[in-house]
Amino acid sequence: MKKIVLLPLTLLIVFGAFAGELAKGSQLYQKYCASCHGVDRAGTVAPPLLPLFLKKIPEKKLIKIIKNGLPATQMPAFPQLTDQQIKEIIAYIKSPAKINWSEDRIVKSIQINKNPKTKKLPVKNIKNIVAVVERGHQKVWIMEDLNILDKFDFKNVHGGLKFSPSGWKIYIPSRDGWVGRYDIDKGSFYGKVRACVYLRNVSLDRTGRYLLVSCWLPKSIVILDAESFKPVKYIKQDGLISAIYELYSKDKAIFTYRDKAKIGFLDTKTFNITYENIPEPYEDFFIDPFEEYVIGSSRKGTRLSVYSLSENKEVFSSKMEGMPHLASASIWYKKGKFYFATPHITKPFITVWNLYNWKFVKKVDIGGNGFFVRTHPTTPYLWTDNGKDKIVLINRDDFSVKTIETKKGKRVIHTEFNGDGNLAYVSLYNKDGDLLIYDSITLKLLKDIPASIPIGKYNIVNKSRKYQPVLLGKQVFMEKCWGCHHQTQEAFAPSFKWIVNHRKPEEIAAQIANPEVMYKKLGYERNAMPKLNLSSYELRAIMSYMMQFKDKKDAKNN
């Protein structure tokens, strides 16, 4: 009986001591920390101090930070605090907190530059602009070709930048809920708003009018006016959203959950949400270029699944070895087929699959644990990383592998291309890292720029979903049309530019599909165009590419 009585007593003593430590920590926090980190620890001028943000930081490091401060972030030192007091503060900030978030707090957080210092950036082609996240210095660079056109600060910048439909505005999220905007056409930082306390990702509706923000704390989708930053709709959620992505072909956005077996469909006009059940949660996913399927994987990493948006059901599932990192997958076209390649977290290989018939093609050993796969029609390679100091290049024709040495002991991570695809921007992910810029065809190193933890690079052509069919269409053009057509100059046949500015899209599609029928309707005496026998996906891809050469009324409109 004594043991039965003593055990609860022991627990009560321990719990009481811990509760006392938390109470002391709370008092110390309010006295020394609340003015910057917020009374409720949600953050104000300094980041939030909550378990989500602190769980990976060792206690020894936190003690050092509080005692000595962080000069780089203007956090003061607190040498007057004893080690015991600091430990009490740490126990408190690592304890659960109740966060009261509201639309009113979002409105109060809005900061817009009323009189920004503008400057004209020497932009030659907006489609070749690359935004670089330098996490170590909490900066974003605006680049074109080999040149840095501007830099600006953004605290706790993580990645996941999004471009407006025109490409002239960039939206920058931080994990602690802030979303900022930089205007390339004015060369200035427009302003920022705090949508939530812990942000997952941001997207824009296809018009660019609304920002769609998925949040983990509080669990919500926050819809903001992209110009005023004011909240338009606050939608509470009861699960952790994996990500939210817009559709370019209709007024919808799609999101999934890490912890719920559902797909959500947000109407970006009415903001109503409908749900469909799936067999298990999609922790990671991407939408195919023609917006017919969602390709997803679970946190368990055991299955690759394909969900049909027209049939509202899963149409394919396959066992996997290692969780595919589908948000980092890459898509291309070759000899009548569409492919995608995905890295696998903690596994030393990538896998290649056919899009649309969902057949496994090949496992390619990359010699280490990779995280990203990128490609572009201009380069013949898949560019990937393996956690080491070499860039891994996989030939798209035969899947042979070769490497490029960078700097010994550094870590290669993430490649991105400019819009033309002739330049590859590669990060060396170290505090004393670098941004390396290569010719994507010759593989010659063109420039080495020192950078502190450069991570994501973002380009409107490679990161905006509306351009995915365009890039595939360029590859269809090179294989099927290049012998007779030029994009802008008359060759054996009219240029794409002439065609799209003189014919209706339905006439163009009909001629490609049935040239032996359409030549008379178009006023030709004979048919000189061969029948290409394109699949519906090939036809949609080449049409998307051709329409890029249509004259635009607004020179700044992409």
Q: What do the PLM-derived regions correspond to, one by one?
A:
Residues A46-P48, E525-P530:
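Short linear capping/connector segments at secondary-structure termini
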Residues L7-G16:
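Bacterial N-terminal signal peptides
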Residues S26, G38, A42-L70, A77, ...:
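Gly/Gly-Pro-rich "capping" loops immediately C-terminal to redox-active cysteine motifs
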Residues A19-A23, K31-Y32, V39, K60-P71, ...:
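Predominantly soluble domains enriched in secretory-pathway, periplasmic, or organellar proteins
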Residues G25-V39, I89, I93, V140, ...:
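The canonical Cys-X-X-Cys-His
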Residues K60, P79-R105, E506-E507, M529-N558:
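C-terminal capping alpha-helices of c-type cytochrome domains
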Residues M1-I4:
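Positively charged n-region of N-terminal signal peptides that target proteins for export
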